[in-house]
Amino acid sequence: MSIDIETARRVAHLARIRVDEADLPALAGELSGILTFMEQLNEVDVEGVEPMTSVTPMRLKRRQDVVTDGDMQDKVLANAPDAREGFFAVPKVVE
């Protein structure tokens, strides 16, 4: 499929990008190349081929969805200038 300059201008307008008139022939050529490649992909026989999301058959490691405190409260509060009763203590902001 061949894209003419007027179609390239319209695509640029729809995409909300500014393209100089001098650059429209190059844009038309690039769009034509993309569409030619897509036409080649449409010719590939994919009958019986399962869709895939990755080239490697990997699964994510799963863990139990359990709420914990992280067992790091003491380490985290050690960085605080003032901590009381297991919480950060901050100066009063609103009277």
UniProtKB/Swiss-Prot annotation:
One Gene Ontology MF term: ATP binding
Enzyme Commission designation: 6.3.5.-
Coiled-coil stretches: none
Keyword Phosphoprotein: no
Primary role: Allows the formation of correctly charged Asn-tRNA(Asn) or Gln-tRNA(Gln) through the transamidation of misacylated Asp-tRNA(Asn) or Glu-tRNA(Gln) in organisms which lack either or both of asparaginyl-tRNA or glutaminyl-tRNA synthetases. The reaction takes place in the presence of glutamine and ATP through an activated phospho-Asp-tRNA(Asn) or phospho-Glu-tRNA(Gln).
PANTHER family referenced in this protein's UniProt entry, alphabetically: GLUTAMYL-TRNA(GLN) AMIDOTRANSFERASE SUBUNIT C, MITOCHONDRIAL
Designated name of the protein: Aspartyl/glutamyl-tRNA(Asn/Gln) amidotransferase subunit C
Lineage, top ranks: Bacteria, Pseudomonadati, Pseudomonadota, Alphaproteobacteria, Rhodobacterales
Gene behind this protein: gatC
